[in-house]
């Protein structure tokens, strides 16, 4: 990839920004089915698609519900014709089928998303493996981003907030393409879930696509390298650094005060979890029958809980890391009351790791907290409020990140 330095975000020598804050392969060609074709034409492919310099990204598509990378079958519509593939399909006898969708894209009807059925542009690779079918969508990075922005931020948000989101998403994607964590095992750069960035869950709108186009190629770098541009929904009043995941925090991620989203429903919340629920989780975790106590034993500099001690009749076990703690304290099926008094049913994770708890053995655990998401990087709700107050997308990024430059990815 190539970059050139545009503007510097932050003030060198003045402590930087008060910050804290979510490659492609060679073109394999495009194949389109015609009315006279029994099957869609297969795009040429080869080892050259493993290049990381083409400006294309390879996305591993998960199944409905985002439970697995493997599909038992795939049904799709290409140029008005319907096709179905299974591991026994003759077209997959060589192990791989590559389809090109053209301008209309490929509609995969066997995958359910929030807005179904999803449409994918570029090429679709169907790989036959012993575990099932792998689906990899290879497409231009900018086209990919048009599927990420509306899936990660409401299209109703202000234009400048959407543009800041587009730059974060682009930077994050380029960073993942360089790291290649899925390349060796799956031949992909990212998947389409919250494991990386949600892609293709909600269809693009003119407004979200415009945000991508108006920031075309812009990424955030430090020392000439793309940063990992994390983002999340709503802060508790302060952002975190990536130290909440262990290790030393990155220099471009600093904890900052964040009052822009202080009136958001998720800025504070409370939930009660029955003691018996946590006792069952403790039993699954440790094998012990009795849960004696739960207490916070460690917090990050920003106030996020990073250590939770669970004491049983046999031992004391400490959970470390915000994700593990939020998972153990999952309010699944419980009622969460938000700041404005509205209620929602809890999911598989505690809304955030910014919380306090009051444990009553044999009764319940009362948890009061603030924020939604991991808290690292840019608060999307705050970004929208900043945009309403007249902040530009560059100024929004300046607030959440430190000592970075805006460079252009090509």
Where are these regions (language model features)?
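Conserved, single-site charged/polar hotspot
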Residues: 1-410
């Amino acid at each position: 990839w190539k970059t050139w330095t545009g503007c510097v975000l932050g003030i060198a020598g003045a402590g930087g920004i008060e910050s804290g804050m979510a490659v492609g392969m060679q073109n394999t060609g495009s194949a389109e089915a015609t009315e006279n074709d029994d099957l869609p034409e297969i795009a040429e492919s080869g080892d050259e698609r493993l290049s990381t310099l083409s400006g294309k990204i390879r996305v591993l598509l998960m199944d409905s519900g985002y439970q697995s990378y493997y599909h038992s079958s795939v049904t799709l519509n290409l140029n008005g014709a319907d096709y179905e593939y299974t591991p026994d399909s003759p077209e997959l006898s060589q192990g791989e089928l590559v389809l090109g969708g053209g301008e209309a894209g490929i509609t995969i009807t066997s995958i359910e998303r929030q807005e179904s059925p999803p449409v994918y542009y570029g090429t679709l690779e169907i790989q036959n493996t012993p575990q099932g079918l792998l689906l990899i969508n290879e497409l231009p990075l900018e086209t990919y981003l048009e599927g990420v922005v509306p899936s990660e931020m409401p299209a109703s948000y202000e234009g400048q907030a959407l543009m800041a989101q587009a730059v974060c998403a682009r930077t994050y994607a380029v960073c993942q393409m360089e790291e290649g964590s899925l390349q060796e095992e799956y031949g992909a750069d990212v998947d389409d879930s919250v494991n990386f960035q949600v892609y293709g869950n909600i269809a693009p709108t003119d407004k979200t696509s415009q945000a991508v186009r108006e920031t075309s190629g812009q990424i955030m770098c430090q020392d000439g390298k793309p940063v990992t541009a994390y983002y999340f929904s709503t802060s508790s009043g302060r952002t975190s650094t990536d130290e909440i995941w262990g290790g030393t925090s990155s220099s471009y991620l600093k904890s900052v005060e964040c009052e822009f989203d202080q009136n958001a429903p998720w800025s504070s919340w409370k939930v009660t979890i029955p003691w018996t629920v946590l006792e069952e989780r403790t039993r699954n975790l440790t094998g012990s029958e009795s849960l004696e106590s739960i207490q916070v034993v460690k917090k990050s500099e920003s106030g996020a809980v990073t250590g939770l001690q669970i004491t049983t009749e046999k031992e004391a076990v400490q959970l470390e890391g915000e994700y593990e703690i939020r998972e153990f304290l999952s309010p699944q099926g419980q009622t969460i009351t938000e700041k404005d008094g509205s209620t929602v049913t809890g999911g598989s994770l505690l809304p955030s790791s910014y919380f306090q708890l009051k444990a009553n053995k044999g009764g319940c655990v009362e948890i009061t907290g603030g924020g939604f998401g991991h808290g690292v990087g840019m608060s999307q709700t705050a970004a929208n409020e900043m945009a309403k107050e007249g902040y530009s997308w560059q100024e929004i990024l300046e607030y959440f990140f430190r000592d970075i430059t805006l460079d252009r990815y090509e």
